[in-house]
């Protein structure tokens, strides 16, 4: 029976560390601040924004939410981003998705200064992931790494199979794991005989967006299984791993909910603080 990779407990420790770092910045006269931009009134986006505000408040990070009408022009959104980019009191900027259909997501996300891009989606930050340079990286792949390292998992030398090639989790995770000296195989929804690959893995990371895709017979005994999926099913949510089955053969497994997702908001806040350091290097 597998032991849990307990994201909730790790998140508590991480938040305490962030509080201490916020305190140190405030002692230097810097009040860390996150600005969130919401266009329209998508109910899920409103909930996400409010949950970030709650976490932000609890950590001592200032929070500013700007809500623009759904019919806002792209130019008005870009003008707001320009003003936030130029404001030295704003250290992190986040654009809530989805944006209205008439707005170019790519243009808007690329307008955010890379050193304030707490979502880690700016093309320059994506490039930094590949090159190994310091930048702001997406919270979910960082969470997959963090949940393992803080649970005592040795990544170096392991064969890690990532199931999923998405822009926000699968692809960046390849390069973040390579930095930890693992051997990486990436699979996806079109991979024939997926189990032939996952059965070779010391560590499986599932991030493909298919409910309970990874079954017991796809996991070698003693493997570590990290579930970064989140899928709505009748009666709740589940991951990309069939948790009840796979926990019988894995040595460690992250649950959904209560695993990887528990760390993501805290890691966004950590990016706000990392952004301060990057901005100071650039002389703002």
Swiss-Prot record:
Reactions mediated catalytically: (6R)-5,10-methylene-5,6,7,8-tetrahydrofolate + NADP(+) = (6R)-5,10-methenyltetrahydrofolate + NADPH; (6R)-5,10-methenyltetrahydrofolate + H2O = (6R)-10-formyltetrahydrofolate + H(+)
Superkingdom field: Bacteria
Entry keyword set: Amino-acid biosynthesis, Histidine biosynthesis, Hydrolase, Methionine biosynthesis, Multifunctional enzyme, NADP, One-carbon metabolism, Oxidoreductase, Purine biosynthesis
Quaternary structure and partners: Homodimer.
Protein family according to the UniProt entry: Belongs to the tetrahydrofolate dehydrogenase/cyclohydrolase family.
GO molecular function annotation: methenyltetrahydrofolate cyclohydrolase activity; methylenetetrahydrofolate dehydrogenase (NADP+) activity
Signal peptide: none
Protein name listed in UniProt: Bifunctional protein FolD 2
CDD domains: NAD_bind_m-THF_DH_Cyclohyd
Species per Swiss-Prot/TrEMBL record: Desulfitobacterium hafniense (strain Y51)
UniProt-listed HAMAP family: THF_DHG_CYH (MF_01576)
Transmembrane segments: none
Entry's Gene Ontology cellular component terms: cytosol
Record GO biological process: L-histidine biosynthetic process; methionine biosynthetic process; purine nucleotide biosynthetic process; tetrahydrofolate interconversion
This protein's record includes keyword Aminoacyl-tRNA synthetase: no
